């Protein structure tokens, strides 16, 4: 339901365009990983995935959203997974995500684990990834689809007052927004290498999206994350078969 709602509401707040790599697809049990820049970007990504590929993924989101009246019930109804960051329950989100993947549902997560603490609305490359994505992919054998979004901070960013003002004025401004969907890939079993490679793939997808909006940050060199087997270790998925867990 929330994916459909996002698809209807996002055009009211901005002008969304979507591109995809050749062969981009969301198969059952796929992990989708996107860059996180704003409270608005989950709606952009959900709308883009539904528009371009007809996908309605389970979203891993901050547990605090479940305390918002009415929203928590809607999130639970769609099977979304609360993430209790910084607590002993944080790892439980990956267990629930694995169950969703096993049932054939795609799962959308944000490997940065937070919105960057910046006040300006301009774009910046994705921050360092946490290891949850690599561990989930390794445990389930799921393919990973990198997604880059740009423009969400034009809707809302910065402190509370600025965020509210951005949302209220967005329907008048209707900023340009762009989402780019990458081709599915397999991550190596080594967690640091897998994390670095996934970060690189999302960064490239983000760069494509930011370039589409004419963002100057798209041309900024990004330091290579540590870890062996950098870009050459990404295995793009050519067939439709899935790797079994532990393979």
Regions found by a protein language model. Name each.
Residues 223-247:
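Acidic, Ser/Thr-rich low-complexity intrinsically disordered segments
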Residues 29-31, 104-110, 145:
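Residue-level preference for the first positions of well-ordered beta-strands
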């Amino acid at each position: 339901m929330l994916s459909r709602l996002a698809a209807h509401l996002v055009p009211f707040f901005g002008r969304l365009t979507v591109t995809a790599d050749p062969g981009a697809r969301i198969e059952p049990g796929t992990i989708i990983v996107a860059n996180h820049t704003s409270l608005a970007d989950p709606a952009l990504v959900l709308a883009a995935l539904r528009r371009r590929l007809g996908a309605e993924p389970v979203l891993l989101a901050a547990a605090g959203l479940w305390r918002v009246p009415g929203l928590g019930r809607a999130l639970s109804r769609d099977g979304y997974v609360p993430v209790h960051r910084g607590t002993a329950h944080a790892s439980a989100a990956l267990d629930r995500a694995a169950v969703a993947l096993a049932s054939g549902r795609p799962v959308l997560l944000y490997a940065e684990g937070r919105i960057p603490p910046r006040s300006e609305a301009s774009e910046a490359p994705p921050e360092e990834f946490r290891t949850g994505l690599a561990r989930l992919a390794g445990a389930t054998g799921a393919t990973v689809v990198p997604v880059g979004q740009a423009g969400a901070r034009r809707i809302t960013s910065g402190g509370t007052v600025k965020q509210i003002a951005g949302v209220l004025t967005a329907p008048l401004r209707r900023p340009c927004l762009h989402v780019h969907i990458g081709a599915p890939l397999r991550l190596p079993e080594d967690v640091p290498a897998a994390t670095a490679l996934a970060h690189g793939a999302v960064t490239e997808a983000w760069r494509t999206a930011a370039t589409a909006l004419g963002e100057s940050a798209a041309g900024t060199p990004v330091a290579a994350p540590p870890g062996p087997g950098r870009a050459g270790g990404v295995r793009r998925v050519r067939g439709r078969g899935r790797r079994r867990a532990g393979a």
